Regions:
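Intrinsic disorder/low-complexity segments
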Residues: 5-6, 16, 26, 32
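Bacterial N-terminal signal peptides
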Residues: 10-20
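Sec/Tat signal peptide C-region and signal peptidase I cleavage site
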Residues: 21-25
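Calcium-binding acidic motifs and repeat modules
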Residues: 26-180
Length: 180
């Protein structure tokens, strides 16, 4: 009986200590939004979408059905050109312009491999998501030590990037839901 009580006590303690880590690792604000965006793109048979985000920032995405979303956001030198392309629904052109000519300091580039939102770490030898933010690259593979980051820094970077990515996805979804 004493052994059974000890086993239960250890199990409860483990769940209490590891529960927050596991739930943090599984929490992704962008996951549901990525699924919604992919569904809208599939329904409309589109492989790209773009939008104006807050202020003078623009966001564009390329979609490879079921496999990946490549999303870029940044400031572009000519707002008139971006607005013209958006008006014509030339989303791929917006994406290309942002990828090549947006201000590096403001550029964010997300490679959502799996098109399922950012994942905290790699799962079972699956590809991992990456982000290039203002000229600095991050790999969300769960290997913060290899990236010369503390676990806390990795968690904070992931949470901030996931929040930012969720906002980009919301802008893209709003574009697709807008009546033509």
């Amino acid at each position: 009986m004493n052994t059974a009580a000890r086993t239960i006590g250890i199990s409860v303690l483990s769940a209490l200590l590891l529960g927050p880590v596991v739930s943090f690792a599984q929490t992704s604000k962008s996951a549901a939004l990525a699924a919604e965006l992919c569904k809208l793109l599939d329904e409309r048979k589109l492989d790209s979408v773009a939008a104006r985000q807050a202020g003078d920032q623009y966001v564009g995405a390329l979609y490879f059905a079921g496999t990946q979303l490549l999303v870029v956001r940044g400031k572009f030198g000519s707002a008139a050109r971006m607005d013209d392309l958006l008006g014509k629904k030339e989303y791929r052109e917006v994406y290309m312009d942002l990828s090549g000519a947006s201000d590096l300091k403001t550029r964010a580039f997300i490679m959502d491999l799996g098109a399922n939102g950012l994942r905290f770490k790699r799962e079972d030898n699956q590809p991992f998501d990456t982000a290039d933010l203002g000229g600095k690259s991050y790999q969300f593979d769960g290997e913060w030590g290899r990236a010369k980051m503390s676990e806390d820094e990795y968690k904070k970077t992931f949470a901030a990037t996931d929040e930012d990515y969720a906002q980009m996805l919301q802008a893209l979804i709003a574009t697709l839901k807008k009546p033509s």
